[in-house]
Swiss-Prot record:
Entry-linked SUPFAM superfamilies: Metallo-dependent hydrolases
One Pfam assignment: TatD_DNase
Residues given in the record as a divalent metal cation 1 binding sites: H11, H13, E97, D212
Organism per entry: Ureaplasma parvum serovar 3 (strain ATCC 700970)
Top-level EC class as recorded in UniProt: hydrolase
Keywords: Hydrolase, Metal-binding
UniProt-recorded name of the protein: Uncharacterized metal-dependent hydrolase UU017
């Protein structure tokens, strides 16, 4: 079944509303188009669902964690999360999405977030899994922690920031995953031209692509619900930006995804 897969959406959420209601149809359309999925949990419930979904087909895998915006019951959730990982280790690609989010200042204290970020890092090391990181307005703190703890296997999810941060992650040997945001129309305010430069300096063996569906729908579907199979719009955009064929770009992205994620051939 995996031999038909041509590309992998490395970060997607068919385990949450509204996509969970369309799961069977989404998976059928993805398989028909040769698209594998890494289904990502953001809390205990969606992590449980991600595992249940990933068990259904070999071209699906999943990531589990507690998102930095969902730490309200973290003490109990984290204990249950580790039990979930231990019992389902073969179906889990990485620990995520976890990390730091300073965008919503009213959510959680920075030190509190950093503590649980470190706990997720410990979990990833214990179970020998990569990290899938959500870092928003917090790159400096995240980089400091990752260096302090000598973290090696990391995917920077949904990277839309400065070229300088991309360069630091590249120097640390991390994978960078680009979302449909890159297909949006450049303006003076969205700094997309700088993001294009980040893509251009990302080594071809460290570049990944994602939808973050149902969010961040790429052009030409922007304004609609995002679906995992829209990942092809983003991969085509990257191919055009880098001046290579879409077929070659998909091959590169697939090889990278299979290298860092847990897909059983």
């Amino acid at each position: 079944m995996l031999e038909k897969i041509k590309i992998i959406d490395t970060h997607t959420h068919p385990n949450i509303e509204p996509l969970i209601e369309e799961f069977d149809d989404i998976i059928f359309k993805c398989y028909e188009q040769g698209i594998g999925l890494n289904i990502v949990g953001v809390d205990l419930k969606t992590s449980q669902t991600a595992i249940q979904q990933a068990k259904k087909f070999k071209f699906l895998t999943c990531s589990v964690a507690i998102h930095p915006n969902d730490l309200h019951n973290i003490e109990n959730d984290f204990v249950a999360l580790e039990k979930l990982i231990a019992e389902n280790i073969d179906y889990i690609s990485c620990i995520g999405e976890c990390g730091l989010d300073y965008y919503h200042e009213q959510n959680y204290d920075h030190d509190f977030q950093k503590h649980w970020f470190k706990k997720h890092i410990e979990l990833a090391k214990k179970y020998h899994k990569p990290l899938m990181l959500h870092i928003r307005n917090a790159h400096d703190d995240a980089i400091a922690i990752l260096k302090e703890l000598a973290v090696q296997d990391v995917i920077i999810h949904c990277f839309t920031d400065k070229k300088e941060y991309a360069q630091q992650y590249i120097e640390m040997g991390y994978y960078i995953s680009y979302p449909g945001v890159i297909t949006f129309k450049p303006t003076k305010n969205n700094q997309l031209h700088e993001l294009y430069e980040a893509i251009k300096i990302t080594p071809l063996d460290k570049i990944l692509v994602e939808t973050d569906a149902p969010y961040l729908t790429p052009v030409p579907k922007r304004g609609q619900t995002n679906y995992p199979y829209y990942v092809l719009y983003t991969s085509a955009f990257i191919a055009n930006l880098l001046g290579i064929t879409h077929e070659k770009m998909q091959k590169i992205l697939l090889e990278n995804s299979l290298r860092i994620l847990n897909f059983k051939k």
